[in-house]
Amino acid sequence: MVVQQHRTKFERLSADVMARWKNIPPAIASDCMNRCYVMSGRISPLSPGMKICGHARTITGMVGDNGPAHVAIGVATPGEILVIDARGHVETAVWGGI
């Protein structure tokens, strides 16, 4: 399997700014960004009240192939959230039962 990695340098938000983002509801953040770079509203927390806030590390792979996710875990840094694009495929999980 070939995994293509794109390493992009970008300015990270400070811990203070990230702490302020934690208090902003996702719908408000989405509206402020004119709904650009937001996920589908069909994606929801695994349990009520669950929240996460961090820098996204995006992953795209072929249907049924979780190899890119395994690579991303080794590359991700503390505070990053893995966002996996399953290309709309809902019959197969990209990571266990999630």
Task: For each feature predicted by the language model, list its residue ranges.
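Intrinsically disordered, low-complexity regions enriched in acidic/Ser/Thr/Pro/Gln residues
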Residues: 1-62
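Ligand/cofactor pocket segment of small-molecule handling proteins
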Residues: 98
